Amino acid sequence: MKQLILVTVIFISFSSLAQDCTKELLQQKPGAWKAGPQGSIHDVSAADLVKEKAVINAIHKMVSTGYAPKGCQVSYSTVYGKNPAAGKNWIADPYYYAMYILRYLCDKNSTDKSKYYVDVSTPTTVNITANVIFSLNNLYASGIPDDDLRGYLKLKQQPKKKDGAWFMGEEVVGDYGMVSEIKEYRWLITYEDKLPFSFITRKEYLIIQKRRLEQTIREEGASDFYNKFMSNINGELKRAEADLMKPAICPWNDEQRFTGFVEEGTPGSFYAVKPNLDYYNKQLPRSCPQFFTVVYKVSKGDPVFEENMAAVKKAVDFAALKNMLGK
C-alpha cells in the first residue's frame, strides 16, 4: 500500500512538472541544432563549391562539438558566392556560416500548460565569414569597382590585436539604451596578423573628393555652396607632405561637403580605407579562405542569449580558424 502511495505521489509530481511550463525551466532545457533554410549559391565554380562546403563543414564541426545549446534551438545556414559587379579582379570567393539562437518560449495561448515552442526570430546571432568583411561596406578579396560612387571604404574603429586576432570593435546596433540593447562584437583572423585593407592618406582622400566635387559641378553647375568645399580641399592640399601622409579620419556625413579632417576618436568619424591586394596569396584557388571574420551579435538582459553566446565564444577557436587560412 505504501509503495502504491509513493508511486502515485511520484506520478502526480511528474504530471505537475509537465504541466508547468516556465521561463526558468525552459532556460535549463537541453537545446538542439537544426539546419535552417540555406542561402544562395551564385557565381561559384563546381570545384570551388566543393572546397568551400568542406571549409564550412569544418567550421560547423568545430562549433557544434564544442558547444551544446541550452534553452534554445540553434538554426544554422550557409551562403556561397557573390555578385561579380561588387568587385573587380576577384582573388577569393566570399562565403559564410550563420547561427541563429532561437529561444524556447512557453505557449501562453495553449490550454496545455506544458506546451512550448521555438521562437521564429532572434536578435542574437553568430556569423563566421570567409573573404568578406560585411561591417566594412563589404570589403571583398577584390578591388573596388571603377564605378563605385565612393572609391573607398569606411572603417569605424582602428583594429586592435587581442587574443591572437584583430578586434574590430563593438557597436550598439539595436535597442540603444534599453535593457535588451543589441551589440555586435567583431573579430578578424588573418595571415601573420596582417590586414586585408590599408589606410588611405589625407592626400589620397582629398584627391578623391576633389574629383567627385568636380563631377558634381560639371553636372549641376558652379555655385558658392560647392565652391567653399572646393576651397577647403585646395587649402588642405597645400599643407606639408608629412601632414598629407597621415591617415584620413573624416566626419561620417561630411564627404562631398568637405570641411576638414578630425582627430582619432572623434564621435561620428571614420577612417577611409581600401583593399590591400598585396595581402593575398594570388596563386591559391578562389575557394581558399584567406581571412575570416567572426561577428557575435547578442541582445543583453536575457540569460538564454547571454549564456549561449558565452558558450559559443568558448567553442569558436581562433587558432583553428587561422590554421585553415590558405588551405
What are these regions (language model features)?
Residues 14-15, 312:
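Generic detector of short, well-ordered, non-transmembrane alpha-helical segments enriched
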Residues 294-327:
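Surface-exposed amphipathic alpha-helical segments
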